[in-house]
């Protein structure tokens, strides 16, 4: 994973954690948790690709890795929709910028996970 993506994740997570969205703060905390989980999953897939011979290890450690991959893509789609919704309803420019960057990062991560998974298949 390149250092720009790492800093982007850290920056967006930090900024999202500072937002006060009133009654939707639980939803935002859920988004932050899923974002962080997605980052860890993407990192582990990337490491498996780097070791290429690790496919058998990945499969034995998690016999349902394709199912897990499918679940991660569903989480990404949900996060993308949630971020788009937040963009539509917020009028705060700080929040708009944060959610725009989060959306861009999600699209990049989706593409990276897709690339990693094709290399592992």
From Swiss-Prot:
Cellular localization per UniProt: Virion; Host nucleus
Keyword terms: Host nucleus, Host-virus interaction, Transport, Virion
This protein's name: Nuclear export protein
HAMAP family: INFV_NEP
Native organism: Influenza A virus (strain A/Pintail/Alberta/268/1978 H6N2)
Gene3D superfamilies in alphabetical order: 1.10.287.230, S15/NS1, RNA-binding (1.10.287.10)
Family assignment from sequence similarity: Belongs to the influenza viruses NEP family.
Intervals of motif Nuclear export signal: 12-21, 85-94
